[in-house]
Amino acid sequence: CEETIDMKKTAILLYDSFCNFEISVALEILALAEKPITVFGITKQAIRSEDGLSIFPDDTIDNLDLDAYDSLILPGAMDIRETIENERIVDFIKKFEKKTIGAISIAPLLLVKAGLLNGKPFMAGINKEELFEEGFSESDLTEMVGWDDNLRKPVEEGYIITGNIIT
């Protein structure tokens, strides 16, 4: 008689121009750990990566059963502006506030927009100056380590952990 453990899943949120190679590495690690995942999108229509790969999500963000998940992964993207302005996506992310969140490359900006990084240190794969041009304020980015910051003074481990959020 095999004992089964009811393992919670990891939600993967994909959006237009997501970075395929960033999410592929994370998915491989989860697969090796036999961690179940669900890929979410705004709709069940194919989502196109920045390199042209189309992925069909397993479910829509409206069908989330939060209790079935213990974590969320947000990939980077070539252009995240439309995604940041989508309130449905921001609301989806807010639901994971008390869960583990991994935000890759530029994806931490989604967490800033969702109010999950207020006053907390984080790393994002972009220069701060570019974000001011996109409407982010100095207070939004006070604790941010960007590309230029990391070149001047590298973060030793290559990521920043703030409570339940990894950037």
PLM region spans:
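Membrane-interfacial amphipathic helices and adjacent loop/beta segments
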Residues: 40, 45-51
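Short, Lys/Arg-enriched N-terminal segments with co-localized hydrophobic residues
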Residues: 1-6
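Short N-terminal binding/cap micro-motifs at the start of the first secondary-structure element
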Residues: 18-23, 48
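Hydrophobic residues within alpha-helices
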Residues: 25-26, 92
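Active-site-adjacent pocket-lining segments in enzyme domains
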Residues: 9-18, 32-42, 58-59, 63-102, ...
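Short gly/ser/thr-rich secondary-structure transition/capping motifs
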Residues: 51-59
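Rossmann-fold NAD(P)-dependent oxidoreductase module
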Residues: 29
